[in-house]
């Protein structure tokens, strides 16, 4: 939407960025300076009992700046981009009605995109077809399915990594159900967000610094009891590695360690690598984002000042 068209709309703020980039710290600081209420945009923070491995805001941070849409589901429950849009729009309306500004913070870019552009008319999940895809993957490997996707939907195959079974499975499922590719259907997006949105992306200017932060944070999680947290989940009979909650970065690798598939050092190595890959994907998404103000997380005071100036303009 053009500035002229959005002038009469209520304001919203997006704080986006890769994992370990300082999004929470910036949002908590903004809460001290602006009349904002925070909404989490994170597909892992929605789950209860998954606090350490998701780097959930601390008790102190939550006291300073309560986050909505955190701890709303059990790890056994599914949650889609459509579910998020429904919940986020409701929270945003409540915040706006109270005379405050919704500040949406997180790293799940698909949720931000769905909220901004509206959801595409994608078919609902089909358990039978999904099971067939999982069976084929078990027999042939996900690389073979990725090659299949390249023939069906080359554009989606470029976006989706062979090591991302959740998105790969969904792309194939959509085609098998509808006869149309994911790329075709995602061009038919819904209504745009009825807010004047100020979008910010925060990340260190140097990639090496982000890598160092990710490694340090993973070790800090282990020292804080991450293994014990996942052991409690592993002991439950209703949770398994194919659930979105257990597929979360860090949890999947710890699960493999607890099941005896890999040793402790390999778990650490894979956990850090997977987190770096996630950060790379998040940055790639953001580089293609329109109308975003980039902030350097290694200069938090300057980042805060930039947001204040843009929002107040």
UniProtKB/Swiss-Prot annotation:
Site (Interaction with substrate tRNA): 108, 130
Class in the EC hierarchy, top level: transferase
Enzyme Commission numbers on file: 2.5.1.75
Catalytic reactions of this protein: adenosine(37) in tRNA + dimethylallyl diphosphate = N(6)-dimethylallyladenosine(37) in tRNA + diphosphate
GO molecular function, one term: tRNA dimethylallyltransferase activity
Binding-site list for ATP: 17-24
InterPro entries hit by this protein: Dimethylallyltransferase, IPT, P-loop_NTPase
Residues engaged in binding substrate: 19-24
Primary role: Catalyzes the transfer of a dimethylallyl group onto the adenine at position 37 in tRNAs that read codons beginning with uridine, leading to the formation of N6-(dimethylallyl)adenosine (i(6)A).
The protein's assembly and partners: Monomer.
SUPFAM superfamilies: P-loop containing nucleoside triphosphate hydrolases
Name by which UniProt lists this protein: tRNA dimethylallyltransferase
Signal sequence segment: none
GO biological process: tRNA modification
Entry keyword annotation includes ATP-binding: yes
Residues covered by region (Interaction with substrate tRNA): 42-45, 166-170, 247-252, 280-287
